[in-house]
């Protein structure tokens, strides 16, 4: 299963969702936000509860994500080297280019595979590094507190 998340940002991410629809990829589970999901999905939802998102990261064979810090951290914690498609300001996908900057920085460290041409997603998936064992957070209490805070803010 390939898990795809566009995060919780209010602007749609049609560029990524359309590319997935054109990709020929199968067995996609897509969290699509306010955008319209591609037709070739096994399962989709506009938003998922945090625990369900974590389960998707755990169960996925591969992860494709926007360049949200939380999504990238969840993917890497589960041993994935995620394909990261940064939202771009010039395309009206975000308010600035911090996702482009983050993707470049993490790609330079080998932590993610930056997707600069969405038509290349299938070949980048094929070439992506194999999944590593999942890692436990260094400070589980801190992570639990952050999770709790995020869950409370999403319930509001």
Question: Residues of each region from the PLM?
Answer:
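Conserved sugar-transfer catalytic core signal across GT-A, GT-B, and GT-C glycosyltransferases
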Residues: 16, 71, 102
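Residues at secondary-structure transition points
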Residues: 11, 48-54, 58, 66, ...
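Short acidic-hydrophobic, aromatic-tinged amphipathic segments that line or gate anion-handling sites
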Residues: 44-47, 111-120
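Conserved catalytic or regulatory cores that recognize and/or transform ribose-phosphate-containing ligands
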Residues: 1, 27-32, 62, 99, ...
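Catalytic binding pocket for nucleotide-activated donors in carbohydrate/polymer assembly enzymes
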Residues: 81-116
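A donor-sugar binding/catalytic signature common to diverse glycosyltransferases
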Residues: 53-92
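Donor-nucleotide binding loops and adjacent catalytic segments primarily
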Residues: 1-59
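C-terminal amphipathic helix plus adjacent low-complexity
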Residues: 123-156
């Amino acid at each position: 299963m390939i898990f795809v998340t566009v995060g919780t940002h209010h602007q749609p991410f049609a560029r990524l969702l359309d590319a997935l629809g054109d990709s020929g990829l199968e067995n996609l589970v897509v969290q699509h936000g306010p955008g319209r999901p591609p037709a070739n999905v096994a399962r989709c939802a506009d938003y998922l509860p945090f625990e369900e998102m974590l389960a998707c990261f755990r169960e996925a064979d591969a992860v494709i994500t926007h360049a949200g810090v939380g999504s990238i951290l969840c993917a890497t914690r589960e041993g994935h080297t995620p394909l990261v498609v940064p939202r771009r300001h010039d395309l009206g996908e975000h308010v600035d280019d911090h996702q482009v900057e983050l993707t470049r920085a993490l790609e330079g460290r080998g932590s993610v595979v930056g997707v600069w041409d969405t038509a290349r997603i299938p070949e980048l998936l094929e070439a992506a590094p194999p999944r590593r064992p999942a890692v436990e957070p260094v400070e589980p209490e801190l992570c639990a507190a952050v999770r709790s805070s995020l869950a409370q803010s999403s319930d509001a």
